[in-house]
């Protein structure tokens, strides 16, 4: 049944798990994943069992995708800057149909548009007509009000969800307030020392980069020995923010999430003590920082907690 191939420049990467690899990515010519998104979503769909999977010893257990024994064929349609052309998307879906896939999983999309203008909806319709099951992501954001993308009735539309596992870190302020966040950082030796807080937004030299702790943007020597408050986003991955803080002499970091992500927090493998907090809690931390001449805080790490329904 399977008629697909691995492109000639990728044949040594294919095996009994990864049986197909093609690139339609704006003429790039290589199926290799440029930023990790494709690898991540492929492992979610069909990753094999991996015993002892963990991040710095956190969340230790057996990792697996939804269909761990399934074969995978990869069709790369997006560029590193996030561009995914309609022509590439349709060409990849057509190729997958011809190759004989059983299921199409697409973790990409945009704001809703009429079905007759939507390349994913059109391609998915053709696949469904040929007996192929099509599953598409509809985004990760919330709790803002919006219309779901990839909502054609012939598509299984899948939204982001949560689980009852957290990798908990707690911010303790000098006024004794505490705020729960998340972080995959795991200190070798617990440290409950209080350090002075430094707000990157209030001390910005570049309003488009400094608040987000973009690489090279933290030039104030006063950062040395302090915990830096950084805003999430700005096109800067969370771990890169931490590296920027570390390079500037900071000893820790608190990332304040965007309001559009609600209570969602990210547990990242940071390079220094760091924690991700919600926008609501971040607002309270900022209020404390601005209310005193010597705002201080410490970050403690509780590790993996199972069974948390919040």
Regions found by a protein language model. Name each.
Residues 1-310:
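Loop-rich non-cytosolic ectodomains and luminal regions
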